[in-house]
Amino acid sequence: MKLTTVLIVAVLVLAACQFTVTDNSGDDTENPSLRSAGENQNPDSTKTITARATRARTNMRRGLSRPSKGCIGGGDPCEFHRGYTCCSEHCIIWVCA
């Protein structure tokens, strides 16, 4: 029982850390939270992002996805512990922001 509680707390702490990590470069133009609210209200955009992320994930597994800039674009899958591989340096729930 105690082990389960400790594991749950550890997972919650790691998840919270993922959301609190910020880019300290001083350039706020890349920050997705500063975009206008109307930009994300299209219901089709979720399907497009999901399809693109699925396609990119499949290509990454096959070794076909090689970003030209040396970083992963927004909406593409990433590894949360390697957020620096995203162009925005923000990997939220395994997707580059």
UniProtKB/Swiss-Prot annotation:
GO terms for cellular component: extracellular region. Keywords: Cleavage on pair of basic residues, Disulfide bond, Ion channel impairing toxin, Knottin, Neurotoxin, Secreted, Signal, Toxin. It is found in: Secreted. Residues 31-45 have a biased composition (Polar residues). Disulfide bonds join C71-C87, C78-C91, C86-C96. Residues 23-49 are annotated as: Disordered. GO terms for molecular function: ion channel inhibitor activity; toxin activity. Its main location: secreted. Residues 1-22 form the signal peptide. Expressed by the venom duct. Residues 23-60 form a propeptide. Probable neurotoxin with unknown target. Possibly targets ion channels. The presence of a 'disulfide through disulfide knot' structurally defines this protein as a knottin. The cysteine framework is VI/VII (C-C-CC-C-C). Belongs to the conotoxin O1 superfamily. This is Conotoxin Cal6.1e. It comes from Californiconus californicus.
